[in-house]
Every structure is written in structure tokens, then in C-alpha cells.
Amino acid sequence: MNYQVTGNEYISLPTIRESDGVVEGVTFLYMQVKGLLELRGKAGLIRPYMEAEGQRLPLHPKWTREHCWIPGFTSEERTFRFSCVYLTPIGERGFMVRLVLENTGDAPQQVRFGVEGEWSQTLHEINETTELNAGREAYESGWNHMFIFSQKPGLPLFAFAPCVADPQQFAQIDQHAEWTRDGFAYDIYRVLTLQPGKKAVLDIPWGVGYDGVAAATSAKELLRQGFDAVYERTVRWLAAREKRLADSRLSKILNTNLFFAFFYASGRTIDTEELCLMTSRSPRYYVSAAYWDRDSLLWAFPAILTVDAAYAREILAYVFTRQARNFGVHSRYIDGTMLEPGFELDELCAPVIALNRYVEQTGNLAFAKQGFVQAGLQSVLSRLEAKRHPVIPLYETFLQPTDDMHNYVYLTYDNALVCCAMRALATLLERPELEQAAQRTRQAVYAHCVKEQDGRPFFAWSVDLNGHYDIYDEPPGSLQLLPFYGFCGEDDPIWKNTVAMIRDKSYPLSFAGHAIAEIGCKHAPHPWILSICNSLLSGHAESALRHLRRTAMDNGVACESVNEDTGECETGEAFATCAGFLSYALYCALAR
């Protein structure tokens, strides 16, 4: 099934069905529960509909996505044109639904149109999903002159509410809307006689907050601002950040994935309003709503930095406070506490590389000199030294970039990242001797990680310093990226031999000869979208673009892997951090 997606800093609509326009669920981040909460309905939380002369008319949506982020559909049936737009305004704790019904016939028609739905469950989502059974309630309130849904397992947890009218003396708004509620089921609608050639409009704001007052007034605020005003404000924000390419299809892919990364790989919590990072705010991604240094800082962060340096700085402030205690640990909750244990060397290097990227792009070295940032950098350096071989300047890892167990503990790619991080630390910590340490590690890689096959030297994937090694590659941490991280040049013959080996048909996970000849790995044995990114950044842009054009991924949004022959999504739908790296790689290859 295909889905449309949209969202802002606070609210995500990750499952808008293309077939009928139904919103299956709404998600938001919540710091006290360490992840995502989702409101869902059995047949849909929000279901647009239209009726004529007492008969429900079927919907046949034809979709658009304004500025690659504002989804809407039009459905034509008999003598009616029905349209629906889902708008998640920038900076607002809510979203709006605009419905427009037009009579294209030559006779008046008695019509009814609106949205109906039900709140049937609340889900807590961090990798896995758990239903919250306690404390759901629905009641009517004077704050929105409608109903409020709330969850109070003792103290309030959250509330969710619409608002379609405001009868106050100085701000009266009357859309001639009606509503009904039966328990947790509702219907919000207009009934009228629609004249030929005329349109009727219904705007339905929804708000989310800690309690009923916060939710209701969030919706009322949107109603008072008006759909057109918040739409124009959101469009201006999006247009200011869009990247334009000569190829319209590639431009659409770049910007769709850019905004998906911005709003699904980061967000603000409803309860504390803190900015935080995660793999994906979509529950469709199989490890959603948790934090990985690598995913957030090596993949999503570069894309976000290209469009919003201030937001990128706030991201780094979160990383060097909430997440600093567990730098290098496999995965964490959004509050920084450990989720999955296991040391990953690439993740330990990621905060340093991201910070250095920010400083180089903005020139804001003062941020890096702040005490909490310096403390975080010192902790990275200390942890690095604890993973160094006692004699040879190579650094070990426990888990590989896929989070899978290592074969041998010294990974070439990981040690290339160490070189990159050490060079950055030399500047950021004003420790020039670390530049020499980086050079010694680089020399150690060439001395111990370069092997030979058929008379041609190449970089092994991993080694144990006792003569054992393996030939392998992982798209989340590919040997193709050694020049990208400054370890070697693209003219390095050893690197060129390595890339030729892992892209050759004889390498079982190269998928050479298939329609999408990009590298996979044992974690997901199909071509990875991250491999397309790696190819774009390593001198194989022409073939990468050809492969990208052959896959729809997850309805235009990055996924983990695709079928090598059909291009259909195989694993990892709604992969937000990967979406960031895809948009950044396209930008580097085509726009910069």
C-alpha cells in the first residue's frame, strides 16, 4: 500500500492512504515516554467523505504534493469535484485539513461533506509497538466548543482536539459546521444546498497538547490564523529551503527526501518542547523513534545543515548534552539513555565529524569552544584511546555499521573515520599532535588492512592483525566513502581496486548485471539506497542516477533496500535518516 506523508516539528502524519485519503494515525514525540506516541483508528483516525442527495460517493484520489511536502488530492465523481489538503504548519502544535466541494453540474445539489473517524487505540512506539490501555477519555469542552480526546493514566498524558468555530465577541468564526460524537467516534461536517458552479469549504484544525486546554487552544490558534495564512507561511518556509535541479524528477526526489529527513529524523517533543533526533518518526520504519549517532549525524545532519544552520546548531546542542553520556553506544532513547548496548566505532566518531562539518560550513568555531561541547569532545577522545590497540594505532569495534556483529575487530572504514575525527579534534581541541595521530592510523591502515588478490592490492573490510581478513562491504559504512571522508584520493590505486572488486559481478552482493546494480550486505541482501548515495559521492554518479530512476523506493521516500530487478521496496520503509543522506548526495553530485 502506498502512503503520502507530511509533518512539522511536533506532528507527523506518516500514514495517509493514497487509495482513499484516510489518515490511519497521527504521531508525536514524548520525552517522558522516551519515544513516539501514536493515535490510531480501526478504520482510520480521519476519513474524508462526501455525500450527495443522501448517498455516500466513492473517492478516487489523484494526488499532488505541493513543494514536495504538502499532500492533497482531488476526486471527481458524477458532477462533483472534492479536494482535501493536509497541512502541518511550521512551528505549530497541530495540523489542518481543508476540504473543498465543488458542484460542476448544472443543477443545485443537497450535499454533505466532512471527516469522520474514531480514536480506537494509543500506541507507544520505539522499535516495537505497545498499546496503552489505561486512561482514554472523551468529553465536551468550552475551550473548543467541541469534543476533546485525552489520555490520563492518572496524571494527564496528552490530549487531541479539533476546533471549527470560535464564537468569541472579537474573533467570531462560523463555518456553518456541525459535529457529532459517540464515544470515541466522531463526525465533523457541513450540510448545504450547493448551487451549480459553486464551492463550499470546510477547514478543520486539530491540536495536540499535554492536556485538553493545550490541545483545544492549539487547534483554535490555527483556526484564528486561518488556513490560507498558515499555508502561505509554510510554503514560504519550504520554498526558501528547496534545492532546484535541472531534472524535475530528481529535484522532486531530492526535496521530498530533504523534507522527510528534516521532519522525520528530528522533531520536538510535545511534553518538553525539546529538539531531538531519531531514525524515523514513522512507525513503518522497523527501528523507529530511537537515536543512532551514525544515522543522525553522518546521514541526516549534512542535509539539514545545507538548509538551516541555526537548526543544525540546535541539533548539535542536543547531541552534546542529552546524548553525550553514551557516545558510541549502539542505540539510545531520545532522552540519551541506553537502548541497545554494544560499542560501534563509527558512531563514536560521528559527533566529531558532524560538529566539524558545522564549523567548516558556518565558521562558528565559538560554538565548538563552549564548555559542554569541549567536554563531549574530550570524552570521545578518551573512549577512542580505550579502543586503541596497545602497539599498533588501529581502533577496534564490536559492532559493524549495520549494527551486526563484527567478523574481525579492526574495520578499515571505521579506522578511516578515526582519521577524519582525529584531524577534526586537532582543531576543535587545539591539540595539533592529534593530526600526527591521525596520520599514524592512516599509515597503520595501509600497513595492516591492505591485502592482495590476483596481484592487485585492495582494502580488506576487516582484519585481526594475525593475518586474517575478509572481503566485504556494508552500505551503512562503505569502503566506497574513503575519499569522501578524506582518507585517500579517488585516484588511489588501492581504493580503485577495492571499489572495482565490490562492484564486480564476482562479488555476490554487488548485484552487478541487475537493473539496480548497487551493493547490498548480509543485513539486507538487496541493493541499498545508501549504496546509491555512496555511488553518488564516489565518482559513480551516472550509474547511481540511472539506478535511482528505476526505483520508486517507498513511494518516493528512501527505504533501506529495494529489489534488484523490479526496484520495489524490500526492507526499511520510511527510513528518514537515509532520506537525508540521499538528498545530500544528490545535492553534492548535481547542485553544489
Annotate the PLM regions.
Residues A290-D293, S379-L381, H389-P390, Y408-C419, ...:
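Extended ligand-binding clefts on enzyme/binding-domain cores
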Residues N257-T269, V307-H330, F372-P393, A437-R456, ...:
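Long, well-ordered core segments of solenoidal/helical folds
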Residues V287-P390, N415, E573-R592:
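Aromatic-rich carbohydrate-recognition surfaces in CAZymes
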Residues M1-L36, S288-Y291, P341-Q361, Y469-G489, ...:
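C-terminal capping/lid segments that line or modulate ligand- or cofactor-binding pockets
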Residues K220-S280:
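An acidic-aromatic substrate-binding cleft motif
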Residues F82-C84, M278-V287, I334-L339, P401-T412, ...:
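Active-site-adjacent structural elements in folded domains
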Residues M1-R244:
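Terminal accessory carbohydrate-recognition/targeting modules of carbohydrate-active enzymes
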Residues V201-K220, Y285-Y286, S331-R332, T337-A350, ...:
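The feature captures the catalytic groove of carbohydrate-active enzymes
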